[in-house]
Amino acid sequence: MGDNKNNGDSGKLLYCSFCGKSQHEVRKLIAGPSVYVCDECVELCNDIIREEIKEISPKRDNDKLPTPHELRAHLDDYVIGQDRAKKVLSVAVYNHYKRLRNSSPKDGVELGKSNILLIGPTGSGKTLLAETLARSLNVPFTMADATTLTEAGYVGEDVENIIQKLLQKCDYDVEKAQRGIVYIDEIDKISRKSDNPSITRDVSGEGVQQALLKLIEGTVAAVPPQGGRKHPQQEFLQVDTSKILFICGGAFAGLEKVIEQRAHVGSGIGFGAQVKGEKDKATISQTLSQVEPEDLVKYGLIPEFIGRLPVVATLTELDEEALVQILSEPKNALTKQYNALFEMEGVELEFREDALKAIAHKAMSRKTGARGLRSIVEGILLDTMYDIPSIEGVVKAVVDESVVNGESAPILIYERNEAQAASGEQ
């Protein structure tokens, strides 16, 4: 086969055997035994084959959908606590993908879309829950920060950029993207700035909620393809967002006060009032678990937006015991990750129980939840990770409470010490 751009050996003008265009009308003309094909026809054939493969390949729906119990078990491997939220998420995600598989309505009953709202303090595991679910289902996942979003036409990130990010995660495969999960963080930060609609435009608050409405409920978003046009006749990729699961999360600081105000209405005043003692007061997590749509409206979310997020799960604040478990128990626990890093240098890393408790205590005092654990561990091990590659004979590093409190450096055990200890035992 040869690439003929000039006239043939005989000086004769060559034509594509398929479309009839001459070699001067196309970029490339590929020659075969007494036949020629141009680059445009090759591209057209590729497109036809790709479309046919797409029509056949989505039958991967035949793969068994994990049950809510199986989804919950997978979450348990990576996320500590939050039992109620795990159950709510597992059922909602299972029902969403069940709805996608049974798209033809039975007896005219169309299944509604159930997007999810996660309410919980910073570092309680909202993002990790969404990410772990996407990984267990092997579907594309992307995250967006609501604070960077603005209405179309204003400086900032357009809401449709979220779909662009999802497409990037699956190499612009629209079919895959339409089965994906989108997590929008800091959703509480786009609450309306006051109860009364303002005369001035609120482009990063209520305006963004309005912009997100259609996207979350389901619309056909027009997204520019990677590297310009995919086909000469097509400028945008059409993505049906009604098949995408949206999970929104936020800390909703101060929401508990809104709930308490509602709960206290009707409790009586004067001699008929019910006075609660200190020990009768509910914790913030207990109060948040009683959230109602009206509380979210009072907080600053518009009713239409709340209506698009019918499944609400509240996460509890992690206590010190839970943080200790997070450090050591999950499959990708922090201590296991750092142990793997040290193993690459041929060194075993040991965290003693008192060290784990001290790390958890420090994270609690910083009020950063599980999110602050990594920075604490990184700070403790920084000097050791800097020195170990240059020191020979180290076989073990031990971290105890005094190391966490900054009173001493991690204990380094050398090969010769190990040998002496072994001979002493004999």
From Swiss-Prot:
GO cellular component entries: HslUV protease complex
Alphabetized InterPro entries for the sequence: AAA+_ATPase, ATP-dep_Clp_protease_ClpX, ATPase_AAA_core, Clp_ATPase_C, Clp_protease_ATP-bd_su_ClpX, ClpX_bact, P-loop_NTPase, Znf_CppX_C4
Domain ClpX-type ZB: 4-57
Domain of life assignment: Bacteria
Chain residues that bind Zn(2+): 16, 19, 38, 41
CDD domains listed in its UniProt record: RecA-like_ClpX
Pfam families: AAA_2, ClpB_D2-small, zf-C4_ClpX
SUPFAM superfamilies per record: Glucocorticoid receptor-like (DNA-binding domain), P-loop containing nucleoside triphosphate hydrolases
Biological processes, Gene Ontology terms: cell division; proteolysis involved in protein catabolic process
Annotated ATP binding sites: 121-128
Entry GO MF terms: ATP binding; ATP hydrolysis activity; ATP-dependent protein folding chaperone; protein dimerization activity; unfolded protein binding; zinc ion binding
Keywords recorded for this protein, A-Z: ATP-binding, Chaperone, Metal-binding, Nucleotide-binding, Zinc
Record family assignment: Belongs to the ClpX chaperone family.
Subunit organization: Component of the ClpX-ClpP complex. Forms a hexameric ring that, in the presence of ATP, binds to fourteen ClpP subunits assembled into a disk-like structure with a central cavity, resembling the structure of eukaryotic proteasomes.
Function according to Swiss-Prot or TrEMBL: ATP-dependent specificity component of the Clp protease. It directs the protease to specific substrates. Can perform chaperone functions in the absence of ClpP.
The name this protein goes by in its record: ATP-dependent Clp protease ATP-binding subunit ClpX
Species name: Shewanella sp. (strain ANA-3)
Lineage start: Bacteria, Pseudomonadati, Pseudomonadota, Gammaproteobacteria, Alteromonadales
Gene that produces this protein: clpX
